């Protein structure tokens, strides 16, 4: 999926970093070959890498001008967050110094290296991700700063040493310095992640065959974390929650893509209007990077016209130059699916028949998502972003396993997390709703919740969660595990106790689609 779309974007004349795709057939060979890459494939990878070197005029592992790559998975059907991504591969103790010299930016070089150690250790060496986050959090506490962006080169240097010590302690090995070993390790890990518990769960929930396998995309890195003329973002060509025909997305200045999706920093809006609607003080991309925004808006329209569907797009801006990293059909709510399908017929992008075929009948019951009864008094304790519509009430749980356990006992739960990760999929499926303290409208929690039709409130920074004591604080309120709360994914409000709901009105778009469906049914019957 991802590799084919990258090639397609290149053909449309859009700026795509050079790279290559290892196909799903290789995944099959990998499993047949006792989970090892066949020699022939390794040779192919090396010659493809030479092509990237030619195009970028950089060399892999070079001590003057090192090539860095990203390694990502690409399944036939997008499985958001199910497979693993590694950025900045090709950095080691020596190439990081070369990168610092080339860019005259020591902070950027060290920040990129610590991110690589973090991702590689987590994905390839199986060191728990939160151990690295804790090291960073403790370091920030001692230094008295709030944000990762407040740390300078010497801070990251110290943390790199701590990270390497952590790997040694956990895995009894030194962090790999050989760039070829790094690359093959990363490719192996992507193939292995196809067999991970979370990927299996997602496939089971979405009827995706186990034998399909995943592809791997290797691509030259472009950097969104070099400074303030750099950024990274995720955007949808229309609103995936409501279906409105307006760009919907988020970006972060001086960041890498993972920061937006993982929800570690709560991002800024892409359009000025969205920023104003949300009452946000931070500059939108349209204001902060007007020239790049204009170019991006053109790309959105071009991609939507080409694929004739709402696209979910990842991009990076390096020194004010736009690069497209991926495009795919975006996950959307049932309500959005109907509105987008009807609108696209009106815009002459698709036919009525195509519009009907695009509606997944299994999701139509979510149109009947209950909404909160306006007449009832509500005790609002916090608010966040309205990430996935609908109202839900249930007992507060802090882990995916607990949500699944209570669901088995026919009890409704609301899963409350700092941010969700792909490991939480089973619990998100079991819970009635999801509440996260961090992350935006394009974070993992938001995208997966919309696809599942689960109400979700994300980025509720007013709540502080304590996993140890199993409680969260919202202002003066303390909510313990097992207490009942209600969330409204349409407004972003979090309420104490059980709030009664009412059945919603069916929209005009729904009746339009049903009318068209009837026309086709009659044609067939006659």
Enumerate the predicted regions with their spans.
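Acidic, glycine-rich flexible loop/linker segments
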Residues: 371, 379, 387-403, 407-412, ...
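Nucleotide/phosphate-binding sheet-loop regions of phosphoryl- and nucleotidyl-transfer enzymes
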Residues: 1-379, 404-407, 411-414, 421-426, ...
